Amino acid sequence: MKSRPEIVILLSTYNGDKYLVEQLESLLRQSYSNFIIIIRDDGSSDETQKIITDYVTRNRNKIYSLPFDQSNIGPSASFCLLMQYALEEKESFGFSRIYMMLCDQDDIWMERKIEIQVSEMLSAEQE
């Protein structure tokens, strides 16, 4: 592999405070390191936004958040906003060509998930 593909993980949250810490920790433990996480909260009323703010503050070059606006637009529209933002801002993250991975707030990712998925994507592109 000449250069490591640039991965943007898109995470939409809504009242997920009981899942979010474990989810974010599973992302930060990935064996593949050339990725960032972009989060959009969909108007949570629990501690989700506080958790996001804490993780963004502690992981400034790895985790980013769209501004909290308290609007609840649903997961599909939220992921669309995240995709649009990732495409428009990829250069500001130092990325040129990106692969996007969607992530639910209650998923726990295995340590090699990104590494294996990138390998499979690159193999498929070769065929």
Task: Please identify what each model-predicted range represents.
Residues 1-127:
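Nucleotide-sugar donor-binding/catalytic module of glycosyltransferases
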